[in-house]
């Protein structure tokens, strides 16, 4: 009954009901690791593709990701409008002690199990259930059967897509939307994130990756015109999180210096957020030893701050470690996640990372939109990753499922909307009546 009531109240208390618009086609671009200041006013001067989208569309000040500010949790938050503790995708690495199964950033076979994905229904599954057609390119999870459904087409992620892969995906997506083979096309591109990790968020390599994306966007605008899609297609671009500098030389917290690793049943992830499962009888000892460690905070599950919307997740560990910005947690220096490169030397050290407190400035992402349903040359106030789902549902013309997003934060972006206030919710009498009918 409690779960049923939560689902009901989520729908009526945390999201608003409005009539779906007459749907147009929708192209969604997820640009991983794209920090909000990468397209500051100064940066836009040398980014003609992004500049044209901003001048002809909507740009929010920044997008605050869900906690933890990692990829998989926010992939699902963006596509469900729900916090991590609701949709259950709480990390890039997860462990289920009941089944002894692991989710390891989507690369191991067990990551494809419905166990991890069926906690909520993402937009592409809702559209498929409504007999819409969905084409997805390199999108993490598009290869998974979720709630018994798969997208119309999935070009599965195998390795980091190249700039040519990205350009080809955009071109093919536009062809699919034009021909009627697709109603929604969604493309994932990772190179900005990869270069930010390897070389740092301010590095020339990361800036080169951004310029390559900008070139594709410039072509995309022309391709939309060439296909006559200007009045039939909305395009939404967003990122999952930002990126900050890390310094492995002097900002690493080695757990082996404070506890015996033999006292841990399981450790998941390294970096800003690390999950620990102590062996039976060792929880209190490990907790008290780690409480004194500087530059990080150790939380027992029930004491995780409510503002993270994290602790109710069923895969959350008994102990969660959260590092201060720029610090990195690992079992030892030997276990740091070096990246493979041609030298095999210290150039393999990572220079950038994310996953920290989601309210930190460097964790902020982007949101841009352009098309017939969006205002032109409009700057919007900051939004949160849970808000993106509602705007996608609206322009796709489908009623959103119950979610944690705020309609009032996004309605201002739409043409013909003069007020930022959400539609009027059901009055209290009607709500009581529905509750009686629903639960009696």
UniProtKB/Swiss-Prot annotation:
Lipidated residues (GPI-anchor amidated serine): 419
EC number: 3.1.4.-, 3.1.4.38
Binding residue positions for Zn(2+) 2: 193, 197, 354
Reaction catalysed by this enzyme: sn-glycerol 3-phosphocholine + H2O = phosphocholine + glycerol + H(+); a 1-acyl-sn-glycero-3-phosphocholine + H2O = a 1-acyl-sn-glycerol + phosphocholine + H(+); a 1-O-alkyl-sn-glycero-3-phosphocholine + H2O = a 1-O-alkyl-sn-glycerol + phosphocholine + H(+); 1-dodecanoyl-sn-glycero-3-phosphocholine + H2O = 1-dodecanoyl-sn-glycerol + phosphocholine + H(+)
Knockout or disruption consequences: Enpp6 knockout mice give birth according to the Mendelian rule and are apparently normal. Mice exhibit mild symptoms of fatty liver and are more susceptible to a choline-deficient diet and exhibit severe fatty liver phenotypes at the early stage.
Keyword annotations of the record: Cell membrane, Disulfide bond, Glycoprotein, GPI-anchor, Hydrolase, Lipid degradation, Lipid metabolism, Lipoprotein, Membrane, Metal-binding, Phosphoprotein, Signal, Zinc
Compartments where located: Cell membrane
GO BP term (any one): lipid catabolic process
Effect of residue 71 to T: Almost loss of glycerophosphocholine cholinephosphodiesterase activity. Loss of choline metabolism
InterPro entries linked to this entry: Alkaline_phosphatase_core_sf, Phosphodiest/P_Trfase
Tissues of expression: Predominantly expressed in kidney with a lesser expression in brain and heart. In the brain and spinal cord, mainly expressed in the white matter. In oligodendrocytes, is predominantly detected in the myelin sheath. In the kidney, is predominantly expressed in the luminal side of the renal tubule in the cortex and in the proximal renal tubules. It is expressed in liver sinusoidal endothelial cells.
Cofactors (names): Zn(2+)
Disulfide bonds listed in the record: 142-154
UniProt enzyme class: hydrolase
Subunit and interaction comment: Homodimer; disulfide-linked. Homotetramer.
Descriptive protein name: Glycerophosphocholine cholinephosphodiesterase ENPP6
């Amino acid at each position: 009954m409690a779960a049923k009531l939560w689902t009901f109240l989520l729908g009526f208390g945390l999201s608003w009901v409005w009539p779906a618009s007459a749907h147009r086609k929708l192209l969604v671009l997820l640009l991983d690791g794209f920090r909000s200041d990468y397209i500051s006013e100064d940066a836009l001067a040398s980014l003609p593709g992004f500049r044209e989208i901003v001048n002809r569309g909507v740009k929010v000040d920044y997008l605050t990701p869900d906690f933890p500010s990692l990829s998989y949790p926010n992939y699902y938050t963006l596509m469900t409008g729900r916090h991590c503790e609701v949709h259950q995708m709480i990390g890039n690495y997860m462990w289920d002690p009941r089944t002894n199964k692991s989710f390891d950033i989507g690369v191991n076979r067990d990551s494809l199990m419905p166990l991890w994905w069926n906690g909520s229904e993402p937009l592409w599954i809702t559209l498929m259930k409504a007999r819409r057609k969905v084409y997805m390119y390199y999108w993490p999870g598009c290869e998974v059967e979720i709630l018994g459904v798969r997208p119309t087409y999935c070009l599965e992620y195998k390795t980091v897509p190249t700039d040519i892969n990205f350009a080809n995906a955009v071109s093919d997506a536009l062809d699919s939307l034009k021909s009627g083979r697709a109603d929604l096309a969604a493309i994932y591109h990772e190179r900005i994130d990869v270069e930010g990790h390897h070389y740092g968020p301010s590095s020339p390599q990361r800036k080169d990756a951004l310029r390559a994306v900008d070139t594709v966007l410039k072509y995309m605008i022309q391709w939309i015109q060439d296909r006559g899609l200007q009045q039939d297609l909305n395009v939404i671009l967003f990122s999952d999180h930002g990126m900050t500098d890390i310094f492995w030389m002097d900002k690493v917290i080695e757990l082996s210096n404070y506890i015996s690793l033999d006292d841990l049943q399981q450790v998941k992830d390294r970096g800003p957020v690390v999950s620990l499962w102590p062996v039976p009888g060792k929880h209190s000892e490990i907790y008290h030893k780690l409480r004194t460690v500087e530059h990080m905070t150790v939380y027992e599950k029930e004491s995780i701050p409510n503002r993270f919307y994290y602790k109710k997740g069923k895969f959350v560990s008994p102990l969660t470690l959260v590092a201060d910005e720029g610090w990195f947690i690992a079992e030892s220096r030997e276990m740091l996640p070096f990246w493979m490169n041609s030298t095999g030397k210290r150039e393999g050290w990572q220079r950038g990372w994310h996953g920290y407190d989601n309210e930190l400035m460097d964790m902020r992402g982007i949101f841009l939109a352009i098309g017939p349903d969006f205002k032109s040359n409009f700057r919007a106030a900051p939004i949160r990753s849970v808000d993106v789902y509602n705007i996608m549902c609206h322009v796709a013309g489908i009623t959103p499922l119950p979610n944690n997003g705020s309609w009032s934060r996004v309605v201002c972006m739409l043409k013909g909307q003069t007020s930022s206030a959400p539609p009027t919710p059901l009055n209290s009498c009607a709500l009581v009546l529905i509750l009686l009918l629903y639960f009696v």
